[in-house]
Amino acid sequence: MKTLQLFIASIWLSLYTFTTSAQSSIEYKVRFDKAESLISESFEMEAETDEPMASITAYILQDATDAELYYRLETFDGWEEWTPMQRFTEGETPGRTTFNGGITEQSFSAIQFKSTTTLPGEVTFRVYYPGSAKKKSPAVNVKDGAGANCSCPKPPICYRNCWCPSGNCPKDTSPSYTVADHLIVHHSAGSNTSSNYAAVVRSIWDFHVNTNGWSDIGYNFLIDGNGVIYEARGDSVLGAHFSCMNHETVGICLLGNFELTAPNDSAISSLIKMLTWEACDKNIAPTLSSYHNSSQLTIPNISGHSHANTSTAPHGCPKGTLCP
């Protein structure tokens, strides 16, 4: 266990609104096709929600644009400073560049967008309200592990009906499958704290499905700061998380940004339990390295995303393409 823990160390707008019992979203389609029109008008929020939490994302239907997008919110104290949106050029859907502005947990009455450059096509901005929920860790449940290859206990897991009880976050109905020989650990690069982690998972689902255009959350599992493990694509399902080399992998994502700080003890404990289960179930030696066929690299059996990328892997994402 200790060895494993050390190892892990003109603006044109078209507005669409739909509301469900638990979630709602608004789409703004904006054109930045003139130098004098790089800042949109401000849009008053029309979606009804009992919770202030919202995620702000965007996509452009073109490959690897160099555009930088921003948004700002009008709150009770007035307009805030512009917030940059992180650009992504790797996704399951070719011909799409996506942006993520993160999650806000404050109430706001209006939103505005801007681009640093003109763009030939429209930009779709999404404001997604993941819905209200109890501000505590969701109840978890464990499916019967009978028939599994491993004798060690499977950790408790919050399945989809646990983190999305409304049923409005459907899984892929025709997934592809893979036999994993490597376990890939990620972080979401979002906030390290939240009042409602299940809502954060629903926001990731919305970003991956409705902004990225994927079939489901890209990871197989996620772990929050309270140590709750969430099933996303689930075991043996081909994910979208390892730079076009997803075959033979299981992707596990820690919710938060751990470039400068380590995950807390609860998250690490659950990660170790999940990795121990997966390694035992799939007969993977956790502290060794082996050949990974999809990347054509010999990498640690428990790796991070950085172990295989466009600069190191022969079969990584070609420059300028969109694949995870």
Where are these regions (language model features)?
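Bacterial Sec-dependent N-terminal signal peptides
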Residues: 1-25
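Solvent-exposed, flexible loop/coil segments flanking beta-strands in beta-rich domains
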Residues: 22-63, 136
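Beta-sandwich interaction modules
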Residues: 38-52, 65-121
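Hydrophobic/aromatic beta-strand segments within beta-rich folds
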Residues: 56-58, 108-116, 185, 305
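Basic/polar, cationic surfaces and motifs that engage anionic cell-wall
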Residues: 103-105, 127-188, 224-236, 240, ...
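Cysteine-dependent hydrolase recognition
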Residues: 192-193
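Glycan-recognition patch characteristic of GH18 chitinases/ENGases
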Residues: 196-211, 216, 269
